[in-house]
Amino acid sequence: MNPLIFTTIVLTIIMGTMIVMTSSHWLTVWIGFEMNMLAVIPILMKNYNPRSMEASTKYFLTQATASMLLMLAIIINLLYSGQWSITKPLNQTASIIMTLAMAMKLGLSPFHFWVPEVTQGIQLSSGLILLTWQKLAPMSILYQIFPTINLNLMLLMSVLSVAIGGWGGLNQTQLRKIMAYSSIAHMGWMTAIMAYNPTMTLLNLVIYILLTTTTFMMFMLNSSTTTLSLSHTWNKAPLLTMTILTIMLSMGGLPPLSGFLPKWMIIQEMVKNDNIITPTIMAVTALLNLYFYMRLTYSTSLTMFPSTNNMKMKWQLNNTKSTAHVSPLIILSTLALPLSPILMLLE
């Protein structure tokens, strides 16, 4: 892709998200979403092949449907209140439709079907953008409308997302699909706490982006897309193998790693609000996530697949890819739990 065109597209993606996050008018929110969606499609099609075209088409159709629902919610709210302002409380019907639109954009269950398919059809770098940056705009809208969100609807979608995120990843060998199902589960945790404590949702979002970015960086360093290709990491970089092991367990939410922190705080907050059944179900289904991450860890780091003698010598070759940015990401994505007393003061 031409560097000038690529820079323009990236700036448009950033601008679209910023317009959504800073706007106080519903029409400009919709415009921001459209800018973001139309600019991200060329990024998804960067590696031009039938698979990426299919993924881009699925993404476009899903996001266009969500934008249509968003506009419907805005018009219904305008009819009832006569207001375009985002700061005014939403009408109940408009709030439900808007919640469904944002759930579709985030990939929450039962609108999750596009996430694994789209992520599998694109490059790792495009998948990183899709599963991190593209979550910011819908999450900021949910954050702003949280006082009018229907609690039962949100909790139902959250529990379903955590369950499907766990079940879906169990039989996968493709790393991008595993990350997609993990993203669905993480979105479920974030939206579950939205109606109780939206600040905690932001904390969870930051940790999720940190963990996902680090994991994708590791995959990109090794050019790994399947469990088998990841299992050959020990040939190229033995130290990196140990790091991947730790990050995988952190993604699964195993204490005392960083990934455990948001789950712990969310369960604690929901119990404080006399909601015990929901966090119990979510904690049990989250074990499915931990299981497939532990299985991935086992096959990557604790077993040695049959390989030729030439394969065993790969560690002697110099790695031409820069790894300077990976070290701080690894530290933050594994060792952030001691920050929990400070973070609990932010509630």
Curated annotation (Swiss-Prot):
Lipid bilayer topology: Multi-pass membrane protein
Cellular compartment(s): Mitochondrion inner membrane
Substrates-to-products reaction catalysed: a ubiquinone + NADH + 5 H(+)(in) = a ubiquinol + NAD(+) + 4 H(+)(out)
Predominant location: mitochondrion
Function in brief: Core subunit of the mitochondrial membrane respiratory chain NADH dehydrogenase (Complex I) which catalyzes electron transfer from NADH through the respiratory chain, using ubiquinone as an electron acceptor. Essential for the catalytic activity and assembly of complex I.
Binding partners and assembly: Core subunit of respiratory chain NADH dehydrogenase (Complex I) which is composed of 45 different subunits. Interacts with TMEM242.
Name listed for the protein in its UniProt record: NADH-ubiquinone oxidoreductase chain 2
Origin species: Boneia bidens (Manado fruit bat)
The encoding gene: MT-ND2
